Amino acid sequence: MNNAGDTLSDNLLGDAAERLFAQTCTPALLRAAEQGQPIDAAWRACEDAGFADALVPESLGGAGLPLAAALPVVLAAGRHLCPYPIAHTMLARGWLAAHGHARPAGPIALAPHGLSVADHRIAGTNVPWIRVASHVLAQINGQAWLLPLQAADVQSNGVHGSLDGEASWALADAQCLGPIRASDEQNGREGREGRLGRNGHDGRDGQDGRHGQDGPDGHNGQRAADTPDALALLAATAYAGLMAGAMERVLAMTLDYANTRAQFGKSIGRFQAVQQQISVMAEEVWAANMAAQLAFQSQVTQPGNLPRVMAGALPNAMPGETPGSIPSAMPGAMPGAMPGAMPGAMPGAMPGAMPSAMPSATPGATPGAMPGVMPSVMPGAMQAAVGKARTSQAAPRVADIAHAVHGAIGVTAEFDLQLYTRRLRDWRLAAGSESFWHAHIGAHALQGEDSALDFIRRVAQGQA
């Protein structure tokens, strides 16, 4: 089980990320990114803090943290809508390092679906983070490809404010890294043993234009429909954490607005109908938080290592609030809602600096790891599927209730709520919506002979 040292480590890392993102990833910066303005300074601050290489082994210059330790950073990135793919980059660099591939500089986007090869080019119509990333780590017909943005022809996808877009590359500019699978951490080494050339011309994936496109339905003619590949699991995990963090912030904004907006002589948060809706919203937010914790459990973990509830449960009324009002913040869950009150913060810690040592760590070991076992950067397949499915399921309901409480002001360009709800709806579909992942979960459950309860237990324990 997780111990106090792990909790403190998570708090230190999450607090450092919270401070950095609060200072560098403002709503103004996100609006600038949506308009195509550069955000290089914000990215450099994040990379200098060490977050991008948090999952890379220490022997390769990273922090060597286990997958679960990355969740507080991803939640903070979601709360502040970081306009660069830090969650994707952390997971992509960890995966590349684990498979012996060079890690390119700059932010990396994960694109498990939507890219295809035809007429000597690789192309996609809705490539994630294409307007702000420097590379795309893509899955095409069971192969991993590293695509540099400098060589890409990028076009708008026509969606207002989207950081995704259309892109294409000459095949000669792309680097094939070899075959990938969902549960084999060693398979990346196969691609380094010379079976494939630089552009992956092995006779199955050549240049004759007869290439299927890997879509969110998982069908590409070569892979089982109920076996998500590694990049799909990584992307699902990243989006689960981002959505959970963004929903925390949306709930905080809604609570604050409900307690300050007066109607008929009292705050609207004191009306029972509004309280009931926000209660439903809070349930969805906390379900998403727990789902994200489940998704960030790596394949190498302690049996029975269930995700823990992050510091603070749904609180009672805060001091000074009138009876019947809605609590203004959830301590420990949304540090951004309470500036300066971050439980577990290190006194005197430098803003934005990732803690260089974790209290529970021993030399050469990573916090929370099993003795003698290197934690995997890969999430458990069913844990990632459940995490993404549940957060995607919660996203539209949270967004709808937030806009219902805010009314017309919530959709105005000047108000920040629409920045969050637009991304929640985008991220709900990214890397597969809840219906896509529900199909995988159901197919996996039907393959076994467990009861429903036993299946849930095995998923929660990473044994499914």
Regions found by a protein language model. Name each.
Residues M1-H80, Q186-G188, R195, T237-A464:
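Alpha-helical interface subdomain recognition
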